């Protein structure tokens, strides 16, 4: 059965402070399509329009021109049910403290479900589930005060508050910023599981190309307020000409393999995971040993 589009952005434009000396064109003719159940990464340099784009997904910004369709609903209409839309599309922003409203962790995560009018029992179940997804122990953390949390913990609480709404679309702006390596891996694994097992549609903005390679089914590259390139991680990160043209970063594993390839070694340059890249390096080292070659500096 073919998948259906759950997000359709066509020729979207947005200008901040139009008609003033501070006027700034943030989006110009941007296009983006997301199928239900996909995991999509949006990458690009600071100021390329990524954050402005995702704020159109749940009505925080309304389209000035162009089309924004979310789960079949046209957001350019005058009357849009924002409450329903924002239950359907959950956004976790880069600064999580802006999304924390309550003094106690459990109360903050329960805030959204209570606003939906859900009974106490269901709210409690949603809070427990959401906390488990982000790696917060319910009994240990539910009564802690939010002001005393680290930046990484606040990010987890903000994400749990969105997940407790059970959205159809999860939008993440730099999801692992402020997390230590272990917490980062755990959270990425859980996001991937939600996407693959729960069929949750995920759209995320990231400057971390390892995350992009690990999670994304497809990648959109933005520059100067518009989409300039789209493809799978393999298609994006193995096209050296476009990487250079748009100054796209690459996963560290790919950088190492490209360097080995430039030195004349036969390696796969599309090995994104550490394990795959390590296998390629081992092959090179084994060949050097058998041929009594010296390892060159890379």
Positions of PLM-derived features:
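A short, flexible loop at the N-terminus of ABC-type nucleotide-binding domains that lies
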Residues: 2-6, 15-29, 78-81
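Helix-to-loop junction immediately C-terminal to a conserved catalytic motif
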Residues: 58
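ABC ATPase NBD Q-loop/coupling interface
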Residues: 67-84
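Conserved ABC ATPase signature
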Residues: 145-149
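Conserved catalytic motifs of ABC-family nucleotide-binding domains
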Residues: 166
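Catalytic Walker B motif of ABC-type/P-loop ATPase nucleotide-binding domains
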Residues: 170-173
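Conserved ABC ATPase "signature" C-loop
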Residues: 224-225
């Amino acid at each position: 059965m073919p998948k259906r589009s759950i997000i359709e952005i066509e020729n979207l434009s947005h200008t901040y402070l139009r008609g003033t000396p501070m006027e700034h064109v943030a989006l110009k003719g941007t296009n983006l399509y997301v199928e239900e159940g996909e995991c999509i990464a949006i990458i690009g340099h600071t100021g390329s329009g990524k954050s402005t784009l995702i704020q159109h997904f749940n009505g925080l910004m309304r389209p000035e021109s162009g089309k924004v369709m979310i789960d079949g609903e046209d957001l350019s209409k005058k009357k849009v049910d924002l409450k329903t839309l924002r239950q359907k599309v959950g956004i976790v922003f880069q600064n999580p403290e802006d999304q924390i409203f309550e003094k106690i962790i459990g109360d903050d995560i329960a805030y959204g479900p209570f606003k939906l009018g859900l009974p106490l029992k269901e709210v409690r179940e949603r809070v427990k589930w959401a906390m488990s997804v982000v790696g917060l122990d319910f009994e240990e953390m539910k009564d802690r005060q939010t002001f005393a949390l680290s930046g990484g913990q606040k990010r987890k609480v903000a994400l749990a508050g969105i997940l407790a709404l059970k959205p159809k679309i999860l939008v993440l702006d730099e999801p692992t910023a402020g997390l230590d390596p272990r917490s980062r891996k755990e959270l990425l694994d859980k996001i991937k599981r939600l996407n693959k097992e729960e069929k949750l549609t995920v759209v995320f903005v990231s400057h971390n190309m390892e995350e992009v390679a690990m999670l994304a089914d497809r990648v959109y590259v933005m520059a100067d307020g518009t989409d300039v390139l789209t493809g799978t991680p393999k298609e994006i990160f193995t096209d050296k000409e476009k990487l250079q043209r748009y100054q796209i970063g690459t996963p560290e594993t790919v950088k190492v393999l490209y360097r080995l390839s430039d030195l004349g070694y036969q390696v796969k340059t599309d090995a994104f995971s550490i394990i795959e890249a390590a296998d390629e390096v081992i092959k090179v080292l084994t060949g050097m040993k058998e041929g009594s070659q010296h390892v060159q500096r890379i």
